[in-house]
Design a protein with these regions (language model features):
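Transmembrane alpha-helical insertion/packing segments
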Residues: 2, 6, 12-59, 120-121
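Juxtamembrane loop-transmembrane helix junctions in multi-pass integral membrane proteins
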Residues: 14-31, 56-63, 90-97, 101, ...
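Cytoplasmic membrane-interface segments at the C-terminal ends of transmembrane helices
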Residues: 19-26, 84-99, 154-175
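Hydrophobic alpha-helical membrane-insertion segments
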Residues: 35-39, 101-116, 184-189
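Individual transmembrane alpha-helices with interfacial aromatic-anchor signatures
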Residues: 134-151, 173-180
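Membrane-interface interhelical loops and short amphipathic "cap" helices
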Residues: 48-64, 122-139, 195-204
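Hydrophobic cores of alpha-helical transmembrane segments in multi-pass inner/ER membrane proteins
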Residues: 2-3, 71-83, 142-159
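Final/C-terminal transmembrane alpha-helix of multipass membrane proteins
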Residues: 174-196
Length: 204
């Protein structure tokens, strides 16, 4: 009687983890931008739950303000989680192309928003002027407002580039992420307000 032996080749087994640790600068870039996103989301939570004065003009459009706050809280939460996933082993559970594209998309969105604001400020000669935010709840120098978004954009790009290199993700996903940035920014700045007007939550 012939005994049939089955040999399991290494290619039939689950491959060992291919996760490689990020560069130190990439890890700290991801941690810094995740902290920024969570802290910034905290500002929206504060505005949503009592941070706006009773006589603030925002109270006149409070329904729209609530929707926009919830939207940006969600976006910032996703941004923080994405940044952490790019430098942690548990991030390997997510598709690498999705992480790379999301990191570059976040970088593109923030840098584009900062660049547009900076361009308008320079054109209007208002770079050093003070600007009111959130219905006057915050007053900061105009240049600081642009910098507030530019710096995390650079951090997202740094961590995203390192993740792309380590994971061997194709460059096309980074490009697609960057191309998607203007679409998401347009949806937040123009698409959502348009929908809120249709819903009667913002004046026409």
């Amino acid at each position: 009687m012939t005994t049939i032996t089955h040999t399991t080749h290494t290619t039939d087994r689950m491959p060992p983890s291919t996760w490689s640790p990020p560069a130190r600068w990439a890890r700290w870039s991801a941690y810094a931008v995740a902290t920024w996103a969570v802290a910034f989301a905290g500002v929206n939570v504060w505005l949503l739950f009592g941070g706006v004065a009773a006589d603030s003009p925002l109270r006149e459009v409070w329904g729209a303000m609530t929707v926009m706050n919830l939207l940006v809280i969600a976006l910032k939460g996703v941004g923080a989680a994405t940044a952490l996933a790019s430098v942690q082993p548990w991030g390997e559970r997510l598709p690498r192309w999705l992480l790379t594209g999301s990191m570059w998309g976040a970088a593109g969105l923030l840098l584009l928003y900062a660049g547009l604001n900076l361009g308008v400020m320079i054109a209007d000669g208002q770079l050093t002027a003070m600007t009111a935010l959130a219905g006057g709840e915050f007053i900061v120098p105009a240049w600081a407002y642009a910098t507030f978004f530019a710096v995390p954009g650079i951090l997202f790009a740094a961590a995203g580039r390192d993740h792309q290199r380590r994971s061997g993700t194709s460059r096309r996903w980074a490009i697609l992420g960057l191309l998607g940035a203007p679409l998401l920014l347009g949806a937040v700045l123009f698409g959502m307000p348009a929908l809120l007007r249709l819903a009667g939550l913002l004046p026409a």
